[in-house]
Regions:
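Active-site beta3 strand of CheY-like receiver
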Residues: 46-52
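Receiver (REC) domain active-site loop signature in two-component systems and cognate sites
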Residues: 57
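Acidic catalytic/metal-coordinating carboxylates
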Residues: 35-38, 61-64
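C-terminal output helix
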Residues: 88, 106-116
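Short, conserved "switch-loop" micro-motifs in signal-transduction and mechanochemical regulators
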Residues: 84-85
Length: 122
């Protein structure tokens, strides 16, 4: 069965970039959310195997959404990403249960390595 991946970013072009990278490499069950609140709702609906989520978003930021998702499912696989590669953000995400952290701008190889490490190959 194909692994489901939820892509969360308020910037449509960032979601598209990750989606294109993953779909070209065999990941086909890709879903999108536009902010943290949307991510929490879609997480409940879809039950994704992995969430790749931006930190800085309107309505509910990625760290709050991470906490809400982990409260629903303590074993949820969430990878945080942000242009802010600051240590405090990374540590906050890890303390809140993130499996990994990717810094923007993305390198496709880094995204694929992170996804395959967590989910295995498509």
């Amino acid at each position: 069965m194909a692994k489901k991946i939820l892509l969360v970013d308020d910037a449509a072009f960032m979601r598209k970039m990750i989606k294109d990278t993953l779909s070209k490499n065999g990941y086909t069950e890709l879903f999108e959310a536009v902010d943290g609140a949307d991510a929490v709702e879609k997480f409940s609906e879809i039950g994704p195997d992995l969430v790749i989520m931006d930190i800085t978003m309107p309505n509910m930021d990625g760290l709050e959404a991470l906490k809400a998702i982990r409260a629903k499912d303590s074993s949820a696989n969430v990878v945080m990403c942000s242009a802010m590669g600051q240590e405090s953000m990374v540590m906050g995400a890890v303390r809140s249960g993130a499996k990994d952290f990717i810094v923007k701008p993305f390198k496709p190889d880094r995204v694929l390595k992170t996804v395959s490490t967590i989910l295995g190959n498509p």
